[in-house]
Amino acid sequence: TLGMGFIFVKDLENLKNEVEKLSLDTQKLDLTILDFTGKSFFSFAIENNIKLTELHNSVMNILKQFSSYGDADFAMFNESEKVKDDVGLVKWVSNFNTEHAFDLYDPHITLGKGEKPNFDFPINFTASKIGLFHIGQRGTCKEKLAEFNLKYFFSR
């Protein structure tokens, strides 16, 4: 999760354009999954680094232009979604910019619930894309709205 916010449909294309511009100036990120976090509903804990923090801050600065923080409500969720009834999730997203972003950023990938599979941590990977998603249960990525390739840099 690089950022969260409630976006009105009328602002979605402008948001996509801004995130695409950002992606054209952002190189792929080498990241490390440290472990799982959570108990019944879990995430991968991602090791923070300067480039990830910079990307998060840039994404949040874009989201602040288009997001409705603090005054969001259940009506902003898709009617078919159970998430619209999740008071905790609405509060989480409504307050993301003040309670979970910038200096409070905790990089993670929300996975879901159930039994945790066995992995040998740490796991290194390269993030080559960023995306915009419609939120699903417990803050998971439900529906991809857009995806953007990050810029390649080659060392010499």
For each feature predicted by the language model, list its residue ranges:
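Histidine-dependent nucleotide/RNA phosphoesterase domain, centered on the 2H-phosphoesterase fold
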Residues: 1-156
